[in-house]
Amino acid sequence: MNAVFFETTIFSRLRPGYLDDDGYRLLQIYMLASPESGDLMPGTGGFRKLRWHDERRGKGKRGGLRVVYYWLIDGGQIWMFSIYDKDEVSNLSADQQRQLKAAIDAELRKRGNR
């Protein structure tokens, strides 16, 4: 599959603390092969949360990183929103879920996708 990756400012700022360039490249290759691999996050309008191993801390997918992204199927785009360690955040609050949904709805309306 061909797709373009877009990063939010937050993701771009956080990513180097969790993944070096080679690790990020491996994540992108995996996501290109399986863009639906992340679990759908209820109440977010289609965001997905992908579990990813954390080589720096020797953690597998279960105890490793979480990557929040949105796959825009029609546009062949993967929008990278956030990355964090499982130990830092377990689940998003209902308010955070609503904020993600509002953000993606506004962006898709602007693009004419919703």
What are these regions (language model features)?
Residues L19-D39:
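Compact soluble domain cores
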Residues M1-D22:
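Arg/Lys-rich, positively charged N-terminal/basic patches that mediate binding to nucleic acids
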